[in-house]
Protein backbone atom coordinates (compact mmCIF):
# COMPACT_ATOMS: atom_id res chain seq x y z
CA UNK A 1 0.00 0.00 0.00
CA UNK A 2 1.10 3.56 -0.46
CA UNK A 3 0.17 7.11 0.42
CA UNK A 4 0.97 6.63 4.10
CA UNK A 5 -0.62 3.18 4.33
CA UNK A 6 -4.10 4.18 3.13
CA UNK A 7 -6.28 1.76 1.17
CA UNK A 8 -8.14 4.64 -0.47
CA UNK A 9 -9.18 8.27 -0.01
CA UNK A 10 -11.98 10.47 -1.34
CA UNK A 11 -11.14 13.64 -3.26
CA UNK A 12 -13.15 16.79 -3.95
CA UNK A 13 -15.32 16.67 -7.06
CA UNK A 14 -18.14 19.06 -7.93
CA UNK A 15 -21.01 16.74 -8.87
CA UNK A 16 -19.75 13.17 -8.63
CA UNK A 17 -17.52 11.21 -6.27
CA UNK A 18 -13.81 10.87 -6.97
CA UNK A 19 -11.44 8.61 -5.08
CA UNK A 20 -7.91 7.29 -5.26
CA UNK A 21 -7.14 3.70 -4.32
CA UNK A 22 -3.69 2.40 -3.41
CA UNK A 23 -2.01 -0.98 -3.41
CA UNK A 24 1.36 -2.68 -3.46
CA UNK A 25 0.23 -4.63 -6.54
CA UNK A 26 -2.23 -4.09 -9.38
CA UNK A 27 -4.44 -6.72 -7.75
CA UNK A 28 -4.47 -4.87 -4.44
CA UNK A 29 -5.28 -1.51 -6.05
CA UNK A 30 -8.26 -3.14 -7.84
CA UNK A 31 -9.45 -4.62 -4.51
CA UNK A 32 -9.16 -1.25 -2.77
CA UNK A 33 -10.90 0.60 -5.62
CA UNK A 34 -13.85 -1.79 -5.24
CA UNK A 35 -13.85 -1.28 -1.47
CA UNK A 36 -13.83 2.51 -1.91
CA UNK A 37 -16.73 2.31 -4.37
CA UNK A 38 -18.88 0.13 -2.09
CA UNK A 39 -18.16 2.35 0.91
CA UNK A 40 -19.78 5.18 -1.07
CA UNK A 41 -22.95 3.06 -1.23
CA UNK A 42 -22.98 1.64 2.30
CA UNK A 43 -20.78 1.15 5.35
CA UNK A 44 -19.17 -2.16 4.35
CA UNK A 45 -18.26 -2.96 7.97
CA UNK A 46 -21.97 -3.73 8.51
CA UNK A 47 -22.01 -6.38 5.76
CA UNK A 48 -21.45 -10.10 6.27
CA UNK A 49 -19.52 -12.19 3.77
CA UNK A 50 -21.86 -15.15 3.36
CA UNK A 51 -22.44 -14.72 -0.40
CA UNK A 52 -19.66 -14.96 -2.99
CA UNK A 53 -19.42 -14.25 -6.70
CA UNK A 54 -16.62 -15.37 -9.02
CA UNK A 55 -15.65 -12.80 -11.63
CA UNK A 56 -13.59 -13.16 -14.79
CA UNK A 57 -13.31 -10.29 -17.25
CA UNK A 58 -11.22 -9.32 -20.28
CA UNK A 59 -10.55 -5.80 -21.54
CA UNK A 60 -8.28 -4.15 -24.11
CA UNK A 61 -6.27 -2.15 -21.55
CA UNK A 62 -5.75 -1.78 -17.81
CA UNK A 63 -7.93 1.33 -17.48
CA UNK A 64 -10.84 -0.38 -19.25
CA UNK A 65 -10.34 -3.44 -17.04
CA UNK A 66 -10.70 -1.29 -13.92
CA UNK A 67 -13.90 0.32 -15.24
CA UNK A 68 -15.25 -3.09 -16.32
CA UNK A 69 -14.39 -4.61 -12.90
CA UNK A 70 -16.14 -1.86 -10.95
CA UNK A 71 -19.07 -1.80 -13.39
CA UNK A 72 -19.52 -5.58 -13.07
CA UNK A 73 -19.61 -5.27 -9.28
CA UNK A 74 -22.15 -2.46 -9.56
CA UNK A 75 -24.22 -4.62 -11.96
CA UNK A 76 -24.19 -7.54 -9.49
CA UNK A 77 -25.26 -5.15 -6.75
CA UNK A 78 -28.17 -3.83 -8.81
CA UNK A 79 -29.36 -7.06 -10.46
CA UNK A 80 -28.50 -9.79 -7.94
CA UNK A 81 -29.11 -7.44 -4.99
CA UNK A 82 -25.78 -8.24 -3.35
CA UNK A 83 -23.79 -5.62 -1.49
CA UNK A 84 -20.10 -6.51 -1.26
CA UNK A 85 -17.62 -5.98 1.56
CA UNK A 86 -14.51 -7.90 0.54
CA UNK A 87 -12.70 -8.37 -2.75
CA UNK A 88 -10.02 -10.90 -3.65
CA UNK A 89 -8.28 -10.38 -6.96
CA UNK A 90 -6.39 -13.58 -7.73
CA UNK A 91 -4.57 -12.16 -10.72
CA UNK A 92 -4.48 -9.55 -13.42
CA UNK A 93 -2.76 -10.76 -16.57
CA UNK A 94 -1.72 -9.24 -19.85
CA UNK A 95 -1.85 -11.69 -22.76
CA UNK A 96 -2.05 -11.12 -26.49
CA UNK A 97 -2.78 -7.43 -26.10
CA UNK A 98 -5.63 -7.99 -23.62
CA UNK A 99 -5.87 -7.70 -19.86
CA UNK A 100 -7.86 -10.14 -17.75
CA UNK A 101 -8.91 -10.31 -14.12
CA UNK A 102 -9.89 -13.32 -12.03
CA UNK A 103 -11.47 -12.41 -8.70
CA UNK A 104 -14.07 -13.07 -6.02
CA UNK A 105 -16.39 -10.63 -4.30
CA UNK A 106 -17.90 -11.46 -0.90
CA UNK A 107 -20.99 -9.86 0.56
CA UNK A 108 -24.63 -10.47 1.33
CA UNK A 109 -28.09 -10.07 -0.15
CA UNK A 110 -29.30 -6.68 0.94
CA UNK A 111 -32.42 -5.71 2.78
CA UNK A 112 -33.22 -2.00 2.73
CA UNK A 113 -34.73 -2.21 6.21
CA UNK A 114 -31.56 -3.48 7.85
CA UNK A 115 -28.96 -2.05 5.44
CA UNK A 116 -29.84 1.53 4.46
CA UNK A 117 -27.86 2.95 1.55
CA UNK A 118 -25.86 6.14 1.87
CA UNK A 119 -25.42 7.07 -1.82
CA UNK A 120 -26.61 5.61 -5.11
CA UNK A 121 -23.95 5.17 -7.79
CA UNK A 122 -25.30 5.40 -11.33
CA UNK A 123 -22.13 4.45 -13.21
CA UNK A 124 -18.36 4.17 -13.19
CA UNK A 125 -16.85 6.71 -15.59
CA UNK A 126 -13.69 7.20 -17.62
CA UNK A 127 -13.60 10.83 -16.47
CA UNK A 128 -10.19 11.58 -14.87
CA UNK A 129 -9.49 7.82 -14.77
CA UNK A 130 -5.84 7.00 -14.02
CA UNK A 131 -3.84 3.94 -13.07
CA UNK A 132 -0.20 4.61 -12.32
CA UNK A 133 2.78 2.72 -10.98
CA UNK A 134 4.30 4.60 -8.05
CA UNK A 135 7.42 4.17 -5.95
CA UNK A 136 5.27 2.39 -3.34
CA UNK A 137 3.18 0.26 -5.72
CA UNK A 138 0.07 1.32 -7.64
CA UNK A 139 -2.47 4.15 -7.53
CA UNK A 140 -5.85 4.32 -9.28
CA UNK A 141 -8.08 7.36 -9.56
CA UNK A 142 -11.78 6.82 -10.30
CA UNK A 143 -14.84 9.05 -10.68
CA UNK A 144 -18.29 7.54 -10.16
CA UNK A 145 -21.50 9.19 -11.33
CA UNK A 146 -24.04 9.68 -8.53
From Swiss-Prot:
Pfam (any one): Archease
GO BP annotation list: tRNA splicing, via endonucleolytic cleavage and ligation
Stated family: Belongs to the archease family.
Annotated Ca(2+) binding sites: 16, 145-146
Record-linked NCBIfam families: PRK00407.1
Keyword tRNA processing: yes
Keywords associated with the record: Calcium, Metal-binding, tRNA processing
InterPro entries: Archease (IPR002804), Archease_arc (IPR022952), Archease_dom (IPR023572), Archease_dom_sf (IPR036820)
Entry function: Activates the tRNA-splicing ligase complex by facilitating the enzymatic turnover of catalytic subunit RtcB. Acts by promoting the guanylylation of RtcB, a key intermediate step in tRNA ligation. Can also alter the NTP specificity of RtcB such that ATP, dGTP or ITP is used efficiently.
Organism: Methanosarcina barkeri (strain Fusaro / DSM 804)
MF terms (GO), sorted A to Z: calcium ion binding
Protein name in UniProt: Protein archease
Amino acid sequence: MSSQGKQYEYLDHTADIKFQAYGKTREEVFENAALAMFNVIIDTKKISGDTAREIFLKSPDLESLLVDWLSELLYLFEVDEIVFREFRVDNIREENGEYSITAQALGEKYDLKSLPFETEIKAVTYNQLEITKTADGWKAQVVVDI
